[in-house]
């Protein structure tokens, strides 16, 4: 499948953008999303994730990943039926990637891929905050996709 995955690395961040693209595409393919879907992913700083979390979620604390789904209900814009489906944007804190990889005892690459998978699943409607059953469903799907990527739990 062909998807448009735009990865932006903030200045000074040396994350593997190809891994991010591959992880996002793996989720879209596993979820059987139609070709042409678009996702934007920004790898940024802890300070920026803190600001976004505060401004958009009302939570005055840093976090590792945020997803901003495009629900397609903005009546100000008309999109032709044959246009690609824009799913939304994801922001990932690279400092959290490094810290959590060390904390959990796995590679930064695995953590970066995991947070990408987690964020894309949120764009597709998965939400671990909706209770234990949904959290378990999301975690199972994350691990299935991480295995597809060759990055299972160690």
From Swiss-Prot:
It comes from the Bacteria. Pfam families: YbeY (PF02130). GO terms for cellular component: cytoplasm. Keywords: Cytoplasm, Endonuclease, Hydrolase, Metal-binding, Nuclease, Ribosome biogenesis, rRNA processing, Zinc. GO terms for biological process: rRNA processing. Binds 1 zinc ion. It is found in: Cytoplasm. Its main location: cytoplasm. It is an enzyme of class 3 (hydrolase). Its EC number is 3.1.-.-. Single strand-specific metallo-endoribonuclease involved in late-stage 70S ribosome quality control and in maturation of the 3' terminus of the 16S rRNA. This is Endoribonuclease YbeY. It comes from Chloroflexus aurantiacus (strain ATCC 29366 / DSM 635 / J-10-fl). InterPro entries: MetalPrtase_cat_dom_sf_prd (IPR023091), YbeY (IPR002036), YbeY_CS (IPR020549). Zn(2+) binds at residues 118, 122, 128. One of its GO terms (molecular function) is metalloendopeptidase activity. The keyword Hydrolase applies. Its cofactor is Zn(2+). Belongs to the endoribonuclease YbeY family. NCBIfam families: rRNA maturation RNase YbeY (TIGR00043).
């Amino acid at each position: 499948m062909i998807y448009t995955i735009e990865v932006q690395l903030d200045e000074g961040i040396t994350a593997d953008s190809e891994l991010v693209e591959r992880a996002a595409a793996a989720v879209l393919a596993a979820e059987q999303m139609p070709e042409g879907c678009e996702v934007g992913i920004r790898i940024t700083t802890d300070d920026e994730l803190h600001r976004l979390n505060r401004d958009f979620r009302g939570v005055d604390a840093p976090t590792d990943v945020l997803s901003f789904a495009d629900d397609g209900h903005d009546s100000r814009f008309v999109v032709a039926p044959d246009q690609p489906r824009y799913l939304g944007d994801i922001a990932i804190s690279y400092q959290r990637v490094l810290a959590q990889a060390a904390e959990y005892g796995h590679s930064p690459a695995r953590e970066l891929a995991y947070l990408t998978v987690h964020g894309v699943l949120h764009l597709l409607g998965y939400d671990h905050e909706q209770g234990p059953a949904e959290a378990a469903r999301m975690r199972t799907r994350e691990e299935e996709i991480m295995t597809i990527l060759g990055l299972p739990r160690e």
